[in-house]
Regions:
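Bacterial N-terminal signal peptides that target proteins for export
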Residues: 1-7
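Active-site-proximal loop/hinge segments that shape catalytic or ion-binding/gating pockets
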Residues: 164-265
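N-terminal signal peptide c-region/cleavage motif recognized by signal peptidases
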Residues: 14-18
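Charge-dense polyanion-binding interfaces
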Residues: 136-178
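Boundary of Sec targeting at the N-terminus
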Residues: 20-22
C-alpha cells in the first residue's frame, strides 16, 4: 500500500510538472494578459511622460485607441465609433491583426510559477492603467522574450534577470534596492516618480534615438541616461511647474547628453553614449516640437492633480 501511494505521488508530481511545462508560454510567443497580472521589474517610472499621454487622451480620446492598437502590434486604430470601449475590443478595429508588428509590442519574462514579469512597457501600461475606461483589468497582448520559470527559487530567478539586464533595481534617487522591494503592480499608487527619466524621454530624437548599426536598444535605456544625469543636473534650479522652466530643464538635459563623446561611458551603466543611442549634435527642430506639442500637456495635467 505504501509503495502504491509513493508511486501515485510520483506520477501526480510528474504529470503536474509536465502540465506546467506545456502551459508555460515560450520565447517568441504572443499572449493575452490583464494588466493587473503583470509584475513590474522596476520601481520607478517618469510620471510626467505618463501625464503627457493622459492629457493627450483626455483632449483626443481616439489617441487612447491608437495606443492600445500599436502596443498590441496592430498598427494604429482604424475605426473607432463614438461609443467604442477599450475593454471591449469588438467595439472598434485596429489596422492589423494582433502581433503583426512585434517590434512595437511590450515584453515579458516568465518566472517561477508562471508569473509574468514586465520588462518593457511600464509607461505605456501604467498610462492605460490610469486611463478612464481602461484600468487594471484591461487585457493586452505581450511578447515573451525569455522563460526563466525553471529557476529553483526567486533568488536564482532574480540573479538570472540581473545577468540578462532585465530588471532595474534602483529607486527614484538612484539608490539600489533589493528585488523584494519591487512593487507587485503597475499604477501611480504603486510606482515611484523619477523626473529625470521623464526629461530624458522628452529629448528623444533631439539628443538620442535608436542605437545605430542595427544594435538593439538595451532595456531601461532611458534610466541609464537618467541615472547619470542625476550627477550632472540640478533640477532644483528649474521651476518644473511652469512651461518655461520645464523647457529649460529639457534643454539642459539634452545639451548635457549630446556633449558626451560616442565612446564615453554613460555613468556606471556599462554602456557608451553610442550604445545608448546618444547623438553628437542637438536637433533643435525636434526639441521645439516637444516644447510645442508635449510640454503643455504635462504642465496642464500636473496642475489638474494639485
Amino acid at each position: 500500500m505504501r509503495w502504491y501511494t509513493w508511486t501515485a505521488a510520483l506520477l501526480v508530481g510528474a504529470l503536474a510538472t509536465q502540465a506546467q511545462a506545456l502551459s508555460t508560454p515560450g520565447p517568441g510567443q504572443v499572449i493575452e494578459v490583464a494588466l493587473e497580472q503583470l509584475h513590474p521589474t522596476q520601481a520607478v517610472v517618469g510620471f510626467d511622460q505618463i501625464y503627457y499621454s493622459l492629457g493627450l487622451f483626455a483632449e483626443k480620446p481616439a489617441k487612447a485607441f491608437d495606443e492600445y492598437c500599436e502596443t498590441n502590434g496592430q498598427g494604429a486604430a482604424d475605426k473607432v465609433p463614438k461609443h467604442a470601449d477599450l475593454r471591449q475590443p469588438s467595439s472598434f478595429t485596429c489596422q492589423d491583426p494582433v502581433g503583426t508588428h512585434p517590434e512595437d509590442m511590450k515584453t515579458v519574462v516568465v518566472g517561477p510559477g508562471g508569473q509574468l514579469y514586465l520588462t518593457d512597457g511600464h509607461h505605456s501600461f501604467t498610462t492605460l492603467w490610469e486611463t478612464p475606461g481602461a484600468g487594471p483589468q484591461l487585457k493586452m497582448w505581450v511578447k515573451v522574450t525569455d522563460d526563466f520559470s525553471n529557476s529553483p527559487d526567486l533568488a536564482t530567478f532574480w540573479q538570472r534577470m540581473q545577468a540578462a539586464r532585465k530588471v532595474w533595481l534602483k529607486d527614484n534617487r538612484g539608490q539600489t534596492l533589493p528585488p523584494a522591494q519591487l512593487p507587485a503592480h503597475l499604477g501611480f499608487k504603486n510606482l515611484q516618480d523619477d523626473t529625470l527619466r521623464s526629461l530624458v524621454y522628452f529629448t528623444r530624437k533631439a539628443a538620442y534615438g535608436k542605437p545605430e548599426g542595427g544594435d538593439i536598444a538595451p532595456e531601461f535605456l532611458e534610466f541609464y541616461w537618467g541615472n547619470w544625469l542625476r550627477t550632472q543636473i540640478d533640477l532644483g534650479a528649474y521651476n518644473l511647474n511652469k512651461k518655461s522652466g520645464y523647457k529649460a530643464a529639457i534643454e539642459a538635459v539634452a545639451r548635457r547628453m549630446v556633449s558626451l563623446a560616442p565612446g564615453a561611458p554613460v555613468g556606471d551603466s556599462g554602456f557608451s553614449a553610442h550604445q545608448l543611442g546618444g547623438m553628437t549634435q542637438l536637433d533643435r527642430s525636434e526639441l521645439e516640437k516637444t516644447f510645442d506639442k508635449k510640454v503643455p500637456y504635462v504642465i496642464d495635467y500636473r496642475k489638474s492633480r494639485n
